[in-house]
UniProtKB/Swiss-Prot annotation:
It comes from Cryptococcus neoformans var. neoformans serotype D (strain JEC21 / ATCC MYA-565). InterPro entries: GINS_A (IPR021151), GINS_bundle-like_dom_sf (IPR036224), GINS_Psf3 (IPR010492), GINS_Psf3_sf (IPR038437), PSF3_N (IPR055221). It is found in: Nucleus. The GINS complex plays an essential role in the initiation of DNA replication. The keyword Transcription regulation does not apply. The gene is PSF3. Keywords: DNA replication, Nucleus. This is DNA replication complex GINS protein PSF3.
Length: 189
């Protein structure tokens, strides 16, 4: 996972909104909450993009609650059946659930950070075999045949988040290259 200042995916992962509560009065920042007031007062809740929430939280200007995509409800669903959770729905269609979760864990205290990292790891390891099988199937499938979009595999594919879609594409390309190599070797015998 790249965490580069100039990376579009890194920028997109930092753009998710977080609910923050100001821990002190902030003069001249009233525009952040869309208010006509010039200042933000202590205890005011504001939705901020992650990149700003992170900076304000690290400097103890704000506190935040854990975003819904990483809540105990989502964690329980991932434990029950990792492949049935539509990660794309949790962070938006082109969202980056793993990247945002990693960045979130990096700014949390020990126990919470460990819980988030473990959730990310369990989700990834629980979903990877299905992702790999699906990529291999799509790489070798005869795409002239109509496929059922309601199958579990297609539902999983629709629920993949950004990093999973990248891995899926790499897996498809790899499968096609292997098939082409195998067909060449088989034909030369």
């Amino acid at each position: 996972m790249e965490d580069d200042y100039f990376s579009i995916t890194s920028i997109l992962a930092d753009n998710h909104k977080m609910s923050c509560t100001f821990a002190l009065d902030a003069e001249g920042l009233g525009y952040l909450e869309g208010s006509t007031e010039n200042d933000i007062h202590e205890g005011t809740k504001v939705e901020l993009p992650f990149w700003l929430a992170q900076t304000l939280s690290v400097n103890q200007f704000t506190t935040f609650t854990l975003p819904l995509p990483y809540s105990s409800r989502v964690q329980s669903a991932l434990v029950a059946s990792p492949v049935s959770v539509k990660l794309s729905n949790l962070v938006g269609g082109n969202g980056w659930w793993y990247r945002w979760g990693k960045k979130l864990a990096d700014m949390l205290e020990d126990e919470q950070a460990t819980n988030i990292r473990n959730m990310l790891l369990r989700a990834f390891t629980g979903r990877l075999p299905t992702l790999q099988d699906l990529a291999a199937h799509h790489a070798s499938a005869d795409h002239t045949m109509p496929e059922l979009s309601t199958s579990k595999a297609e539902m999983f594919r629709d629920g993949m988040e950004g990093d999973e879609r990248e891995l899926f594409s790499i897996g498809q390309d790899s499968g096609r290259l292997f098939k082409a190599w195998y067909d060449r070797k088989k034909g030369s015998r």
